[in-house]
Regions:
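Short, charged recognition helix plus adjacent turn
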Residues: 1-8, 62, 72-79
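A short, Lys/Arg-rich alpha-helix, primarily the initiator
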Residues: 2-23
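Residue-level signal for the short linker/turn that defines the boundary of a DNA-recognition helix
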Residues: 15, 25-26, 52-55
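Alpha-helical residues within the helix-turn-helix
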Residues: 22, 33, 62
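Short alpha-helical DNA-recognition segment
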Residues: 25-44
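Short, basic-rich loop-to-helix N-cap that marks the start of a DNA-contacting helix
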Residues: 49-59, 78
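DNA major-groove recognition helix of helix-turn-helix/homeodomain DNA-binding modules
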Residues: 55-70
Length: 79
């Protein structure tokens, strides 16, 4: 996978997490606590700056009732 594609996936992941979080009326701090990470790391995920572990991705998909493909931008359908 090229670096450009990798960075685009991280950007989409961050955008989708932000959208889902805001739909639930949650703050970034609440998401960070839910995921047991620092606020700064969560902000970096939403900013498309860092990747997340596979298990965290699966937990987020379950929490928001969406597919991992949706979170990664591989599908436009949430389910």
């Amino acid at each position: 996978m090229s670096r450009r594609v990798y960075m685009e996936i991280l950007k989409i992941l961050g955008q989708r997490l932000r959208e889902l979080r805001m739909e639930r009326g949650m703050k970034q701090r609440e998401m960070a606590e839910l995921l047991e990470m620092t606020l700064r790391n969560y902000q970096r995920i939403e900013g498309g700056e860092i990747n997340i572990p596979t298990l965290t991705l699966c937990a987020l998909a379950d929490y928001f009732a969406v597919t991992t493909d949706y979170l990664l931008g591989r599908s436009g359908r949430r389910q």
